[in-house]
Amino acid sequence: MTPVLVINSGSSSFKYQLIDVETERSLASGLVERIGEATGVATHTVFFHGEDAAVAATKATSSRELPIPDHTAGFAVMLEAFGEHGPSLDDARPVAVGHRVVQGGARFFEPTLITSLVEINIDELSALAPLHNPGALQGIRAARAAFAQVPHVAVFDTAFHQTMPAAAFTYAIDRETAERHRIRKYGFHGTSHKFVSEAAAAHLDRPLSSLKQIVLHLGNGASATAVHGGASVDTSMGLTPLEGLVMGTRSGDIDASVLGVLARRDEMTPGELDAFLNTRSGLRGLAGASDMRDIERRRAEGDPHATLAFDVYIHRLRAYIGSYLAQLGGADVIVFTAGVGENSAGVRAAALETFGFAGIHLDAARNESPGRGIRVISTDESPVTVLVVPTDEELEIARQAYTVAAR
């Protein structure tokens, strides 16, 4: 057994998962939330695996409410949960701790062993990700105190996209201003895009280095990435996760002049504009609901707002698919992943129905058929293979953390 603890920390909560990287099975997972509030909540789940890997694990979940004043207290609660409910960290002591960090800027292009200097650099990059990096740093500091003798590794969402050429990541604004404020496209969901593109190549038994892939990570947050030979060459998210596709609550691409209009006419502050575009836009802004399942249900019932929201979502998605087909000079593989991508046959069908000219042909029965794991949903004759690949960012973080720790 080679356990790696994966931490995904925010400002008021953190998720954790203990993964055996030998078997790639989850041993336990949990969520500590409402940190700093009067009453916090800690949930811990233990997984029990049999000899047959094909048989789903059974699990036992426990939950408790108690004051959790800060992340250090939260980690103490997590350790108590392992001690009380298992697995015992004496028997399954982590060989490494992997931390998800959203923004690594141009500085971090690979998973990195965390030192005091790395902590300082992550803190400095908080200017580019004020909603994410500070919470990650709180988790890192608490985890390093709780597991002082274990290597800690930062895995950056942005790292996978550091292979983009300058033409893809450069914004056409004043160069000196852009350099001074580090304004450029960084991209996000990189850990997922890396995991999924590699899993697709392995499933097809084709060399990753030979494939042109378009990976569509469609969840509440959504991004598209053009992957050539295993490297990101373009991606839809930009300086922040706001740019690109229509999302659950984010607008995606928008004329920047809209911000000036709202600032002048509604006297909105920069913070209010950020909140407007990130939390009150996207599907929620168009139809009052951020969940694609609700949008599709209401669309089927004839709701005009849900219908328009779905149509705008698909229009934007097709635009990016078409753009990346042009950037790559065609594609070998298109991959759908994350909550919407893995579960909405309607979104997948609508997104690809106009791309027959590019050799993309869905098999309707395969697309509609529910299934677990990786599955092909294109026809046998389709020149471009279309796959559904469940993402597993925690497993990818565990793999990368173990690789760095074992050096």
Indicate residue ranges for each PLM-predicted region:
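Short glycine-rich, Thr/Ser-proximal phosphate-binding strand/loop in the N-terminal lobe
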Residues: 4, 13-68, 238
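Glycine-rich beta-strand-to-loop/alpha-helix junction loops that act as flexible
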Residues: 9-10, 99-103, 218-220, 331, ...
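Short beta-strand-loop/turn "lid" adjacent to the catalytic site in phosphate-handling enzymes
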Residues: 82-132, 151-153, 159-170
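Glycine-rich phosphate-binding loop of actin/hexokinase-like ATP-binding domains
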Residues: 160-265
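Catalytic phosphate/nucleotide-handling subdomain of diverse soluble enzymes
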Residues: 227-269, 275, 338-369, 375
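Internal helix-turn-beta structural module
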Residues: 307, 311-329, 335, 341-407
